[in-house]
Design a protein with these regions (language model features):
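Short, flexible, basic/aromatic active-site loop/helix in glycosyltransferases
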Residues: 58-76
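Short, well-ordered turn and helix-capping elements at secondary-structure junctions
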Residues: 44, 68-72, 168
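Left-handed beta-helix
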Residues: 28, 35-36, 61-63, 90-174
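A recurrent flexible, glycine/aromatic-enriched loop bordering the glycosyltransferase active site
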Residues: 49, 72-85
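Conserved nucleotide-sugar donor-binding
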Residues: 10-11, 83-94
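A generic fold-level signal
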Residues: 8, 50-51, 59, 78-80, ...
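A residue-level structural signature of the nucleotidyltransferase/glycosyltransferase Rossmann-like core
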Residues: 13, 21, 55, 80, ...
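Conserved beta-loop-beta/alpha segment of the NTase-like Rossmann-fold superfamily
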Residues: 1-59, 97
Length: 174
C-alpha cells in the first residue's frame, strides 16, 4: 500500500500501520532519524513472544542490525519488535519493487543489513488491533487514556457521522 503513495509523498514522512493503537509520541523517533540518518527509523516495542511480529537486532547507536518478520521460535534473536510506526525518507520508493510486496519481508531486512535503519523503543502501551478482541482492547485503551477529542469538519464533500470525532486542531476540508 505504501508504494501507492510514491507520487504524493516527498522528503521525510511518517507512516503508521492502521491496526496499531499505541501511546507512541513520534517526535523522539523523528529526532533519532535526523540524528542517525538512513532511510528509515522504526518505533520499537518489547514483547514476551515476538513470533507474531517483525523482530530487530539493535546496536548501541540505535541502528537496526537485523530484521526478521514473524520468526519461528528457533529464529528469535530479540524481543524487540517493529511497532508498525515509521519515519521514512522518500528514497524508500526507489528500492520498492512494483506490484505486490511486503516492506517487512522484502525491504527492511536489506536496509538493516546495509545500516540504513534505526530503531527507537518507546514505553506506555502497544496494541496490535488486528483481531476483534484486540480491537476492543485498543478502543478501551483510547478511552482510558483520553485519546479522543474533537476537531472540525469543513466543506461539502466529506461525510461525517454525528457521532464521529476529529482530533483537536485537525480540519477536514473538501
Amino acid at each position: 500500500a505504501l508504494a501507492n503513495c510514491s507520487d504524493v509523498v516527498s522528503g521525510t514522512f511518517a507512516c503508521f500501520n492502521g491496526d496499531i493503537v499505541s501511546s507512541l509520541e513520534i517526535t523522539p523517533v523523528l529526532d533519532l532519524h535526523k540524528k542517525n540518518g538512513g532511510i528509515g527509523t522504526l518505533a520499537l516495542w518489547e514483547v514476551e513472544d515476538p513470533t507474531r511480529f517483525g523482530i530487530v537486532g539493535l546496536d548501541d547507536n540505535s541502528r537496526i542490525t537485523q530484521f526478521k518478520e514473524k520468526p519461528t521460535k528457533e529464529e528469535v534473536f530479540s524481543n524487540l519488535i517493529n511497532a508498525g510506526s515509521y519515519v521514512l525518507e522518500d528514497d524508500i520508493f526507489d528500492i520498492m519493487p512494483r506490484g505486490k510486496h511486503s516492506i517487512e519481508r522484502e525491504i527492511f531486512p536489506g536496509l538493516a543489513a546495509d545500516g540504513q535503519l534505526n530503531g527507537k523503543q518507546f514505553s506506555g502501551y502497544f496494541i496490535d488491533a488486528g483481531t476483534p478482541e484486540s480491537w476492543s482492547e485498543g478502543v478501551q485503551a483510547c478511552i482510558r487514556n483520553k485519546r479522543f477529542s474533537s476537531g472540525e469538519v469543513c466543506g461539502g464533500s466529506w461525510f461525517s457521522n454525528p457521532m464521529a470525532k476529529v482530533i483537536d486542531g485537525a480540519r477536514i476540508v473538501g
